[in-house]
Amino acid sequence: MSSLRTDDDTWDIASSVGATAVMVAAARAAETERHDALINDPYAKVLVEGAGAGAWRFIADEDLVAKASESDTEVGALFEHMKNYQAVRTHFFDAFFSAAVDAGVRQIVILASGLDSRAFRLPWPAGTVVYEIDQPLVLDYKSSTLAAHGVAPTAERREVPIDLRQDWPAALVATGFDPARPTAWLAEGLLMYLPADAQDRLFAQITELSAPGSQVAAESMGVHAPDRRERMRERFASIASQIDIEPMDITELTYEDPDRAEVAEWLAAHGWTAQAVPSQDAMRRLDRYVEVADSDGQSFSTFTTGTKL
């Protein structure tokens, strides 16, 4: 159970769940500058810089990361793992969309899109429509920031400013979404912020809106043992203190439900094919795996893809 969440909480890009999007974008910005980058996100840095002095901006600041690493020998490995994980995750789901459009899908839905810039940076085929669903203030920040820098989408982009706990299917259809057409759905960095029953409801709604041939991709997180969650909380608080930033504890924003359905199993039982890839396998395949202290197999995430029968 999350201690900082309520059934009707909202946020902008600088608070609560919204601020975690800054962390993800900062990791993409750092990855883009590597000589051996797995992804290219030329807009991540701009989106991070405009988000204010949040706790997660420092991930893209090598000097601050080095300072934190000097005071804790395990911090360097931890942040290398965090950045590599985000790079591998982004690479995996970029490839998912590439395969989907190669299969003829031209309708894309990104759930809880945050600072996702795929509508602006991926080479979408003509006729592709990308729907982004998220909190109104989050979508407004991204659109206004990129527009101010002269950045235009590479596909037709339609915003659906609504909380996923509300009637988002109706809002999506009202924006022009056609349930009769195959769709590629993405739930990246989302499910851990939903209670188990809300996750089931989300996939039921996706299934209801999906024509045969639709595809879905999702990231699901493993469950951390309580003692490991506490060690993570203490470590991040210590790091924040050392580099003089406001601490932020993601574990207080997420729902760790041991009865949460495995995504692949849920999909297979509801008319989809499904394949699950452990994130550590994806990281090893791309030579980006980093051993982190106190890690355990259950704490890793899984990347799941499926096709509607």
Swiss-Prot record:
Binding annotation for S-adenosyl-L-methionine: 134, 163-164
InterPro entries: Ppm1/Ppm2/Tcmp (IPR007213), SAM-dependent_MTases_sf (IPR029063), SAM_mthyl_Trfase_ML2640-like (IPR011610)
Molecular function, one GO term: methyltransferase activity
Pfam families: LCM
EC number(s) given by UniProt: 2.1.1.-
Keywords of this entry: Methyltransferase, S-adenosyl-L-methionine, Transferase
Biological process annotations from GO: methylation
Top enzyme class: transferase
Gene3D superfamilies for this protein: Vaccinia Virus protein VP39
Presence of keyword Aminoacyl-tRNA synthetase: no
UniProt record similarity statement: Belongs to the UPF0677 family.
Stated role: Exhibits S-adenosyl-L-methionine-dependent methyltransferase activity.
The protein, known as: Putative S-adenosyl-L-methionine-dependent methyltransferase Mflv_0743
Record organism: Mycolicibacterium gilvum (strain PYR-GCK)
